[in-house]
């Protein structure tokens, strides 16, 4: 006769008050305050290091069990958050809201219409665009890319339609087969409304900016734009990056801050030319070990993420790194100084900034070590 599985450990539900709302959290009865903080991180976006839990007027000590501090089923706990110690865009509160991109665009367009009359593209001579190779239509109250643009064909090197209300990029983008820079920042482009098939036909493209749109995913076909050197996808709602991003061997700059990215594919190690990466204000808990393959990396910002450690031998492998921003993560200066290769990294960045240090004015100018001090005991 088979023995029955052991019963699950007993649990309690704690009512946590934070940001104008009450959050019920189920935890094992034997849990510690540190365990409760880890459970609260995805529910509040506040890093455990930035949480102070108070029950019945007493601060809960991390290492102590909840039961030893008289926290029982139904207990009410108040969460106080340290400023700046959060992942993503900020702590999740009752009144947290991000204005819909379409609302923001509509407001921008309305202001533009007040300041100037609508751009009458039909009166703009496409011949001038062809002569200069540049189409500059930013802040032009556009809801779509004008048809006249596609007729310019291979004459165009730069297309800038940023800060409009454009909702789609059609297949006709393929007609701009000599395009090098495509600036689509601050529009209303959502998943499925951009012809990636058309974009992959533009093999001359080196700069693509899709920041401040409504993207949730990027397709695998992104990896087919093989000459891309700069990719800007900040301020969207991206939850991940496609595995195929590792095919972008020439990519030098990746700006993907203020999204909802929870993990990175290990294939990112294939982006061997990367020298600047901004992944700040996302939901990352770790960086893949393959980050160590980025031997040309000079600047990395992962501010306001849930990171607790760096890849092994990160400082040793990324031997050109001189700028690192880990503020608002679980990695403090004390932790950072224990990482192998930190001394060499510190020497490189201090050498770069030596002139600033030599000519600093007053005692308030302090060299930024790249991470926070440990606030846990404040």
Curated annotation (Swiss-Prot):
Describe the outcome of a gene knockout: No visible phenotype.
Keyword Repeat carried by entry: yes
Q: Where is the composition biased (Polar residues)?
A: 93-106
Residue span of region Disordered: 85-120
| InterPro entries, per the entry | Leu-rich_rpt, Leu-rich_rpt_typical-subtyp, LRR_dom_sf, LRR_domain-containing, LRR_R13L4/SHOC2-like, Ubiquitin-like_dom, Ubiquitin-like_domsf
Matching entries from PROSITE patterns are given as:
LRR, UBIQUITIN_2
Domain Ubiquitin-like span(s) in chain numbering: 10-86
Known SUPFAM superfamilies for this protein? L domain-like (SSF52058), Ubiquitin-like (SSF54236)
In which tissues does this protein get expressed? Widely expressed except in panicles.
The record ties this protein, via SMART domains, to: LRR_BAC (SM00364), LRR_TYP (SM00369), UBQ (SM00213)
Q: Which UniProt keywords apply?
A: Leucine-rich repeat, Repeat
Positions of LRR repeats: 129-152, 153-176, 178-201, 202-225, 226-250, 252-271, 272-293, 294-317, 319-344
Q: Biological process GO terms, please?
A: intracellular signal transduction
Q: Which family does it belong to?
A: Belongs to the SHOC2 family.
Task: Summarize the protein's role.
Answer: Leucine-rich repeat protein that likely mediates protein interactions, possibly in the context of signal transduction.
- This protein is called Plant intracellular Ras-group-related LRR protein 8
- Gene that encodes it: IRL8
